[in-house]
């Protein structure tokens, strides 16, 4: 099969990012032959090697690549909020939640250079994302509400100021949906962080929906905590990722 026909078949299958196994099925050749076949196109820059066994068309969108590196993965946190035009600044790193590996990858395609942070989390917390079809492929990306909840789950990976701005300046956030996702995370600390964030931003009327064991007082003063409480607050606000 020549290159043009191979690309047409990839696009028909919406596989702008594909595996060696995918290519083998398309050209119907043995694995060793398929590997050599793809190597020729990589050398001529008609394909991009993402990592061992994963390839992409040069025209692939970065987001398509980010969610095709490992199965059951999706873009989240600031990159998701940027995708929905909830924040204006594109983040340097793209956070991708998955159930397999934690790893950093630097990707270079004709469109530019990007860094992906694959973050492994438990499978029960891989929810709240959707498939969005592109012209020739697709991406998996968190809803705005789940992107915020994921940021509360691992706050070291996302500055709180961006989350505050998203909640204050956007009409694209469904607060009840946000709370439902937070409850579904089954993380007490996520709920406390959300409650404190609501208190700070004066988002009221939702305490009864947050399934936390203890309600944080609205007048909770962080500047007057005791030394004994400091460790616990570090745990709550993200100096620790214990959940």
Q: Would you name each region that the model predicts?
A:
Residues 28, 85, 153-156:
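Hydrophobic/aromatic-lined pockets within catalytic cores
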Residues 1-78, 171, 175-178, 186:
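Short beta-edge/loop segments at beta->alpha junctions of small alpha/beta modules
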Residues 16, 30, 87-88, 204:
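Short coil/loop linkers at secondary-structure junctions
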Residues 31-40, 101-109, 120-122, 136-137, ...:
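Short, mixed-charge, low-aromatic patches
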Residues 129-243:
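Hydrophobic alpha-helical interaction segments
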Residues 44-127:
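Short gly/ser-rich loop at a beta-strand->alpha-helix junction or flexible surface loop bordering the NTP-binding
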